UniProtKB/Swiss-Prot annotation:
The keyword Ribosomal protein applies. This is Large ribosomal subunit protein bL33. The gene is rpmG. InterPro entries: Ribosomal_bL33, Ribosomal_bL33_sf, Ribosomal_zn-bd. Residues 16-41 are annotated as: Disordered. GO terms for cellular component: cytoplasm; ribonucleoprotein complex; ribosome. Residues 16-25 have a biased composition (Basic and acidic residues). It comes from Prochlorococcus marinus subsp. pastoris (strain CCMP1986 / NIES-2087 / MED4). It comes from the Bacteria. Keywords: Ribonucleoprotein, Ribosomal protein. PANTHER family: 50S RIBOSOMAL PROTEIN L33, CHLOROPLASTIC (PTHR43168), LARGE RIBOSOMAL SUBUNIT PROTEIN BL33C (PTHR43168:SF2). Belongs to the bacterial ribosomal protein bL33 family. GO terms for molecular function: structural constituent of ribosome. Pfam families: Ribosomal_L33.
Length: 64
């Protein structure tokens, strides 16, 4: 049997969506799900992803 892996599913949420006063395409918060290796990446994940509500690339941070 295979061992349980060190990969966990994490959720990334946009940091600019709640504080931004820019015009929006629609209401809501942009969230992505991805996997990360807990052994190699112990700190919180931070990626630049596309936010469809703001219609631009924004920083998405890992949430619990």
């Amino acid at each position: 049997m295979a061992k349980k892996g060190t990969r966990v599913v994490v959720t990334l949420e946009c940091t600019e969506a709640r504080t931004s006063s820019e015009p929006r395409r629609s209401n809501g918060v942009s969230r992505y799900t991805t996997e990360k290796n807990k052994r190699n990446t112990t700190e919180r994940l931070e990626l630049k992803k596309f936010n469809p509500h703001l219609n631009k690339m924004t920083i998405h941070k890992e949430i619990k």
